[in-house]
């Protein structure tokens, strides 16, 4: 049994109890009305009987006044008549149209049932509206979540694009710095090579001057010019480590530069030898052609 049927049964029981109580009250009111009518009729009959008795007493009194005056002693000695009270019968209540209590009860129950059904329908209608509102609210929530997810996706894509641009910019800057550093190293190498050539020129000029330095003295002189004093007494452990890394990087760069210069010197030496061989070969070929031209002139041998 559903909840609506239980509610209908409880409501019908309550309506039946109320209907029984109302019927009992109506019956009690009808009984009270009948008793009031009987009392009124009894009072009316008593009044009519009293009036008849008064009329009877007045009639003999008027006709025998002269006799009473003549015979006063006889009138006083006669007894008064006792009043006659007839048996009072309550009037019958007309039947009239009899009421069909079953029909009334049925109509009332139908009315109450219709009202209850209307209330139930209104309840379910309101509940249906609430469910529809709840469904629409859920749809709006889902739509809001989808929009938020889409916004989050767009934001993440934009963030990725921004990170990619930053990475590209960083790589470009690093390439630019590397290029500048390479150019700087190239300029340093060029300057160092120029210094070497200038050192050779100075050496030649010193030779021409008559004063000759040994290789050890040259090395000491160059090292004294290039070596800088290390001020590491006031440095902490981390700074000393950084300084050591810096010195190691400097030594590494110098070794790389030395290796490059050696390779360059070897390549130049090889090119010089190749050019010398080519020159000598060219001179040999040219000399052989000149010898042939001298031996044969105008179709005759000399």
Swiss-Prot record:
Q: Where is the signal peptide?
A: none
Provide ranges: composition bias, Acidic residues.
Answer: 1-55
| Gene Ontology CC annotations of this record | troponin complex
Q: Which residues carry this modification: N-acetylserine?
A: 2
Q: Where is the composition biased (Pro residues)?
A: 82-93
- A GO term for molecular function: tropomyosin binding
Task: Alphabetically list the UniProt keywords.
Answer: Acetylation, Muscle protein, Phosphoprotein
- Chain intervals for the UniProt region annotation (Disordered): 1-99, 138-230, 280-302
Please verify whether the record's keywords include RNA-binding.
no
Composition skew (Basic and acidic residues), residue ranges? 65-79, 138-186, 204-230
Q: Which InterPro entries match?
A: TNNT, Troponin, Troponin_sf
GO aspect biological process, one term: cardiac muscle contraction
Q: Which residues carry this modification: Phosphoserine?
A: 2
User: Which Pfam family, an example, fits this chain?
Assistant: Troponin
Free-text function comment from the UniProt entry: Troponin T is the tropomyosin-binding subunit of troponin, the thin filament regulatory complex which confers calcium-sensitivity to striated muscle actomyosin ATPase activity.
The UniProt similarity line reads: Belongs to the troponin T family.
Per its record, how is this protein called by name? Troponin T, cardiac muscle isoforms
- Could you tell me the gene encoding this protein? TNNT2
